[in-house]
Amino acid sequence: MKRDMYKMFAECLVFTLAIAFLLGFAVACSDSDGKDVAGGSSVDAGVAAITDKNIAGVVQKGPFVKGSNIVLEETSADGSFEPTGKEFFATTRSDKGDFQIDDINLESQFVRLTATGYYKRETTGENTVCQISLRALSDISNRDQININILTHLEYDRALYLVKNGKTFAEAKKQARKEWMEQFGYKNLADDFENLDIANGGKADKALEQISAHFDECMFGEYCGTICAYEINNDCKSVQASIDDLAKIFSTSGKLPSSIDSLKQHRLDDFFKCTYEWMGK
């Protein structure tokens, strides 16, 4: 009798432990699905695959000319935001910078986009002598339009830095937007940069147009009486480096140095003088 009782107790204990293990496993899986963390990055509600998605948009510094190249890169399903090597390609359809990418299938909803081409200058109406590349980082799970512009380019490095340091994607994008707009003197404009279009009349759209025009003058013009980025080395590499370096300097702290003095030794110091002057710094 005692042996039967011990046997029943042992069987009950094994059954209970098995149930506890399964419940613990289920909770762990639930937590992982709720917030996927990999490589130091933080994702809002897990990574979701994308099937048969179509994305349209416009590329604007000024508007990119017809035939400019667009590349959409898939990022890893592990939440690291690293490219997998899978890419989708398009070209702008007109001199308005419009593009469309169809039949997108991805293992993650988070994508990197790069647009490369000449653009119509905001200040002169002429096409640029140099091609430039602008980037954007986006979650396409609930959007079918992504616009690529100078603000998405500047936001890119900062948002990635924040994600890799524990922010969710949504938090990182929101913080990067806020920091950049405050840097430019716009404190109450919180629109997603991918939604902005210089052809539209909203307040944030107009802010993008003004910011883009100022950058055009510092990159190619004679806005502040110093040497523009193109003339520093008389080549196009300096033009691209000017906006890339600005984004990198901003990426870790969420602000630019308070004084141009700290950038005097920078290879593009005249570009920064121009930028700081119209920022009023």
Where are these regions (language model features)?
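Sec-dependent bacterial lipoprotein signal peptides
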Residues: 1-27
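Feature for extracytoplasmic/surface-facing segments of secreted or surface-associated proteins
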Residues: 29-281
